[in-house]
């Protein structure tokens, strides 16, 4: 990574004043910057996180990409894979699990790795506690859950769907064409 010399000088002065190393401060700045950007993205997501649309036809299967929250809580990610379920936590996100219909196809996305499992939403909404917070975990079993394939990276997803979608938000709606392309790729990986 190249950093302008004027910025390096400022970092060195701060490092000296704070009795820290240059690389330590750079790491702090990067971490703080990432945290701030994540907060900004979450604020952008909140008003538009309703996964339903006005023209939804009750008879059509819908497709969704669910970020498993690995970067925040790895245990949530592993629990979803172990139990073959889709889950979300806390107001603003958990309601998306409630809005799923039986038969909707859910792809589980592991940040930095890719789509690592999928199945069709079951009919029963399960509401449980999350990390001591009452009723803050909404989940649904994913019927016919499959996870025994090499994860499909974000780049591969974009390539096979010929589209760009946001992997960072908790849950996003995919088009039928995007969903079909991902299912096709998973089936190819399982027979390879």
Residue ranges of model-derived segments:
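Contiguous surface segments at macromolecular interaction interfaces
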Residues: 2-10, 16, 20-63, 91, ...
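Short beta-strand-centered aromatic/proline hotspots
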Residues: 115-126
């Amino acid at each position: 990574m190249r950093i302008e010399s004027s910025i390096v000088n400022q970092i060195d002065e701060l490092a000296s004043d704070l009795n820290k190393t240059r690389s330590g401060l750079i790491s702090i700045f990067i971490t703080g910057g990432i945290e701030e950007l994540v907060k900004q993205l979450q604020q952008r997501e909140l008003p538009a996180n309703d996964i339903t649309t006005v023209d939804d036809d009750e008879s059509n299967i819908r497709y969704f990409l669910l970020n498993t929250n690995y970067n925040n809580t790895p245990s949530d990610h592993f629990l979803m894979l172990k139990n073959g379920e889709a889950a979300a936590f806390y107001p603003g996100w958990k309601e998306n699990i409630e809005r799923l219909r039986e038969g909707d196809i859910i792809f589980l996305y592991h940040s930095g790795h890719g789509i690592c499992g999928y199945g069709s939403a079951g009919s029963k909404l399960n509401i449980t506690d999350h990390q001591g917070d009452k009723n803050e975990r909404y989940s649904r079993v994913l019927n016919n859950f499959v996870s025994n394939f090499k994860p499909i990276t974000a780049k591969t997803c974009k390539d096979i769907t010929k589209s760009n979608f946001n992997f960072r938000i908790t849950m996003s709606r995919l088009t039928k064409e995007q969903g079909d392309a991902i299912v096709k790729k998973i089936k190819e990986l399982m027979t390879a």
